Every structure is written in C-alpha cells, then in structure tokens.
Amino acid sequence: MARYRHSRSRSRSRYRRRRRRRSRYRSRRRRSRGRRRRRSRRGRRRGYSRRRYSRRRRRRY
C-alpha cells in the first residue's frame, strides 16, 4: 500500500513540474519578444513593417 501511494505522489509531482516549466517558457517568450522589438528598432530597416513581422511570428507559433 505504501509503495502504491509513493508512486502516485511521484506522478503528481511530475505533472506539476511540467506545468510549471510550461508557464516559465511562456514568460520567457514574452520577455524575449520585448527585447527583440527594442533591438529591431535599431537594427532593422525602416521599410520593413514591424506589425507584419509580429503577426507572422504569432501565426507560426
């Protein structure tokens, strides 16, 4: 009985860890997007529209 309970708790912890990692990845993506936008203002040419680029990236994701 004790062994069964232990395995059950382990599976639950694994699921929780997976959820946490997912949220962390989402937050990192948001942060990277802001940083890239700031950098793109300097690096990219004026003719390339930023709105179209962001829309394409979002659709790809």
From Swiss-Prot:
Residues 1-61 are annotated as: Disordered. GO terms for cellular component: nucleosome; nucleus. Testis. One of its GO terms (molecular function) is DNA binding. It is found in: Nucleus; Chromosome. One of its GO terms (biological process) is chromosome condensation. Keywords: Chromosome, Developmental protein, Differentiation, DNA condensation, DNA-binding, Nucleosome core, Nucleus, Spermatogenesis. Signal peptide: none annotated. InterPro entries: Protamine_P1. Belongs to the protamine P1 family. Protamines substitute for histones in the chromatin of sperm during the haploid phase of spermatogenesis. They compact sperm DNA into a highly condensed, stable and inactive complex. This is Sperm protamine P1. It comes from Notamacropus agilis (Agile wallaby). The gene is PRM1.
